[in-house]
Every structure is written in C-alpha cells, then in structure tokens.
C-alpha cells in the first residue's frame, strides 16, 4: 500500500512562486517590465546634483554631455593667408577624437596625442606651402589651435586654471607646467638631438608651442628631464602638454561659477 507524501502547508508556501508585483511582458513582444516609480528623495537629489556638477555618472565614469548641466566648450577658427589655409575645431569636453590632416605626417601624429591624452575632440585640416618647408603650416596651425582654445575657454569660470604633468616615454621624460592666466609666456627647455624626425624639422616643436601660447594667452613651461631619442622626447612633450591642459581646463567643483583669480578676471594682457 503506497502512501501519498505529506506536504506541510508552510513548506508548500515556501516553495510556491510568489505572485510578481510587475506585469508580465508578452513573450517575443520586446516590451519591457514596468517598474514602479520610486520617490526621488533629498539624498538622491543631492547625489545627482553633485555628480552632475563634477561631470561624473552613477558608475563613476565621465558623464556624457546630455547628462551634464554644463554644455560642451567649443572653439572653431578658419585662418586663410597666401601661405596656408587652416580650419581648426576643438571640443574641450570631448572624448579624445582626433581628425587631423595637416600635410605634415609627424605633426598629425602629435595632434593625435593632444586629443587622446587631453580627451579633447580635435579637428585640424590644413593645406600650405609645404613644398618650401613646414614652417608656415606648423606656425599657422598652432596659431589657430591657440585661438580656438581661447574661444572654447570663454570667461574661464570654474576651471582649475593650472596644470602640471610629467610624461615618460621609454628613456625620455618631459615635465609640463601651465597656467591659463591670459598672459602668454613660453619657457622651453628641450634638447632634441637630431635635426629631423622623418621630414619634420625638430626646431618647429618650440615654434609650435610659442605660436599656440601667443594666441591662447597661456603661460607654459616645458622641461626635459631625460631622453636621447628625438621622437620620444617630442611625443612625451605633447603627451605631458595634453594631460596638463586637461587638468587646467577641467572644472573645480568648489569653484564652480567663479573665476579662478584673486583679481576676479582672467584676460589677455
């Protein structure tokens, strides 16, 4: 004689699937589950406000432009002379997208470093009298980038203003210190051992930064700490510059809305 198993009422309740409080979506319909709305309390509002002000999302990643209350800072310059035709666009709040075609391959490579390590979106298109040499194109591109940077910074409210970074590249190491002060000054302490990297005249490195400083109105110090490979020294310089510029242009949460100067203004002198 077989006896039917006895199931405890409490055990039955334990193993039975509870009714879901959420409506079921039809299989294959692609409809999502409707979750009940949660109250948006003061603590959650405060946390969201802090994240928005600091440009950080809920997972700690940088916020996309649509998530942040701060609009992207953009600059665009077209410079046309009898020697060159230059078009530059820069987004200080970008993602590191580079689109450069300058007619100078090594300079394109360096502008890629500026975008990638600064997390700036950088667009540079240029044609010029490179059949003579790269001097005019190199200079006018830097002048246009500096002017676009000046536009993008606007009144400079809330930014860190200062940047400092040391970048190594194998045996080379270069330190960059900068101040978005409105006062153009360059001190360049590079010792590049060869006259050229590829077809690029290495004298043009200092001239590039001098031209950029002149139109952007920044104070820039470049100091070579080590290095004997010309390519490495120059690339470490651009990487350190990009990182320092990123620091200087990013927002200081405690200073949001105010100009980072004791005199209350940052302008070209």
Swiss-Prot record:
What GO molecular function annotations does the UniProt record carry, in alphabetical order?
imidazoleglycerol-phosphate dehydratase activity; metal ion binding
Q: Which GO terms describe its biological process?
A: L-histidine biosynthetic process
In this chain, Mn(2+) 1 is annotated as bound at 109, 136, 231, 235
Q: Which cofactor does it need?
A: Mn(2+)
Q: Which reaction does it catalyse?
A: D-erythro-1-(imidazol-4-yl)glycerol 3-phosphate = 3-(imidazol-4-yl)-2-oxopropyl phosphate + H2O
Give the principal location in a single coarse category. plastid
Protein name stated in the entry:
Imidazoleglycerol-phosphate dehydratase 3, chloroplastic
Species whose genome carries this gene? Triticum aestivum (Wheat)
């Amino acid at each position: 004689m077989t006896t039917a198993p006895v199931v405890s009422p409490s055990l039955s309740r334990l193993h039975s699937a509870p009714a879901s409080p959420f409506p079921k979506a039809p299989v294959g319909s692609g409809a999502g589950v409707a979750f009940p709305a949660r109250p948006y309390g003061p603590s959650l509002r405060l946390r969201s406000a802090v994240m928005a002000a600091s440009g950080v999302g809920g997972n700690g990643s940088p916020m996309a432009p649509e998530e942040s209350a701060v609009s992207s800072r953009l600059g665009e310059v077209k410079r046309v002379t009898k020697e060159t035709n230059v078009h530059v666009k820069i987004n200080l709040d970008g993602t590191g997208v580079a689109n450069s075609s300058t007619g100078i391959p090594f300079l394109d490579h360096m502008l890629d470093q500026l975008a990638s390590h600064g997390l700036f979106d950088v667009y540079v298109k240029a044609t010029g009298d490179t059949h003579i040499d790269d001097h005019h194109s190199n200079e006018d591109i830097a002048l246009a980038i500096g002017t676009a940077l000046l536009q993008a910074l606007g009144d400079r409210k809330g930014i860190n203003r200062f940047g400092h970074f040391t970048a190594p590249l194998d045996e080379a190491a270069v330190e960059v210190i900068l101040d978005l002060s409105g006062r153009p000054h360059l001190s360049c302490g590079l010792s590049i051992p060869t006259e050229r990297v590829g077809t690029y005249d290495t004298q043009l490195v200092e001239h590039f930064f001098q031209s950029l400083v002149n139109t952007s109105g920044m104070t820039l110090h470049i100091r070579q700490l080590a290095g004997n490979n010309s390519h490495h020294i120059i690339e470490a310089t651009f990487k350190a510059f990009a990182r320092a510029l990123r620091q200087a242009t990013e927002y200081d949460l405690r200073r949001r809305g105010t100009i980072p100067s004791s005199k209350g203004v940052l302008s070209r002198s």
